[in-house]
Regions:
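Long alpha-helical segments found as membrane-embedded helices
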Residues: 52, 86-89
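Catalytic beta-strand/loop cores that center a nucleophilic Ser/Cys/Thr
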Residues: 1-51
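Surface-exposed, flexible loop/turn segments at secondary-structure boundaries
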Residues: 29, 62, 86
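Active-site-proximal beta-strand/loop segments in catalytic clefts of secreted hydrolases
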Residues: 24-26, 57-61
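Extracytoplasmic/secreted proteins, especially bacterial periplasmic and envelope-associated proteins
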Residues: 70-77
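Active-site rim elements
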Residues: 61-68
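C-terminal alpha-helix
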Residues: 77-85
Length: 89
């Protein structure tokens, strides 16, 4: 889905080697304020090495995202997954 008017962080190192990436963005689709380019730019991931379930969203600064059904669905699904009791047993 398209994300308009949001802030994109640039990493010095790609986090992909340490996490399980759920979504990424095409760096050619936006303009950065830095010369650092990763090519593959993860924006949503989980980190299975942690004890607690976690989902990291690199974007979500714009309130417009909460009007986007695809983003809302992904956000709700991530909350449901992190809060599931049956995964603790």
């Amino acid at each position: 889905f398209v994300v308009k008017d949001d802030e994109w962080y640039t990493y010095e190192q790609n986090p992909r080697q340490n996490v399980h990436v759920l979504a990424h963005v095409d760096e050619a689709s936006y303009t950065t304020k830095t010369d650092i380019k990763m090519g593959d730019h993860p924006v949503v991931w989980v980190n299975p090495s942690k004890t607690a379930r976690n989902v990291y969203f690199q974007f979500g600064h714009s309130k417009l995202l909460f009007q986007n059904p695809a983003f809302i669905g992904m956000f709700e699904n991530s909350l449901s997954w992190t809060l599931r009791d049956d995964l603790l047993r």
